[in-house]
């Protein structure tokens, strides 16, 4: 596809020589992953009248179009905690002779606490924006334009439940001149089927079961904006904004198109708290509730380089998910958690209670609001071995709970500061060149769920939380 190839070359007749234009062209051609060698050669026209004109010849050497990879690694998925995961991928980088990338991935994970996840993912990427309107012309100052189709089938098995999900999405991705990366997901359709193990679900609070564990259809659209000015020699920063909406279009069509309503065993409609009906949609001959919510998050990170061996990393993140209309509660896997290897490292993932709610070791905690701030001092030890000292502060909350027993989980402005949880700790990082193996030991110093919140006198290794992960936490 010569037109698609030409769109990756930003050199134009008559423009002044500019090295950045050639660098941008080289980067765009490399992004296609179709060439093992790319080179530019320049020559000057041998003419007195055109002595200031350069001719650029571009040489492209075709590379392998098919690649495969097999990976085995330690997983830090917050739902799986620590465990072993593996994947096998097969890729074709020119499947339709237009630098289209097709990737098929099979993956599986096995947690040390009897939690398994297996699935398959298909990604089909076109290196341009495919649309009825000429988006390429509107965004002619952008690079790395992509249209992405994704489909997946995932099964998660926990002692408490089995969750099967099937999803498909259609997205655009592009980067502007200012290095802002945009991702617009026009639609992402997911069907989640939940089957509970009654014996184990008895160990989980009724509040959590009623809120989160149900089969449902999730239609979403989302937009993500991110920016990173990564620089190993200077201070750098990272910014990410995400907003996601689910179900509003279906809800607006439910009444005009006479969607079915959720009913009880007596055939009476089950109404929302405001008296509105709950509509369902037929998925594979089964009536399922479709979700309706809005979710947004903001993540900012700053990396202060003190010198070659010492640096300070700061992260602050705030998120909100609010269910309305057709559903009172947000899907379990869309909500926020606290604890684990990447934020409040003094707690296990899912084990940090929302707000000042009392801890229950048999409950998996989630929240509709999250705020976390972490500061980490990073320093070199010996060769590839590095160390860190950190402090994490934050929590998760529910937006509202009608159950008085869980009132302490609700977010209240006048209790926000008092319900901030704090941990401190230290860790080691070993650089294996291709990845970084990380271990952290976290100690809870402030627990808002306890009457005596400060835990300085209880700091010891018996009360610590060990975390292992790949890469830096942020």
Tell me what each language-model feature is.
Residues 20, 33, 49-51, 79-83, ...:
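Transmembrane beta-barrel outer-membrane domains
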Residues 54, 311-390, 394-404:
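Extracytoplasmic gating/loop element in the C-terminal half of outer-membrane beta-barrel translocons
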Residues 67-69, 78-124, 128-135, 146:
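Outer-membrane beta-barrel translocator/receptor signature
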Residues 67, 115-127, 131-317:
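Transmembrane beta-strand segments of outer-membrane beta-barrel domains in Gram-negative
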Residues 155-156, 206-212, 281-287, 359-363, ...:
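Extracellular loop and loop/strand-boundary signature of outer-membrane beta-barrel proteins
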Residues 1-74, 107-112, 139, 294-298, ...:
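Periplasmic polypeptide-binding modules associated with outer-membrane biogenesis and secretion
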Residues 12, 43-45, 61, 73-77, ...:
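Outer-membrane beta-barrel pore domains and translocons
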Residues 430-435, 460-474:
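Outer-membrane beta-barrel "beta-signal"
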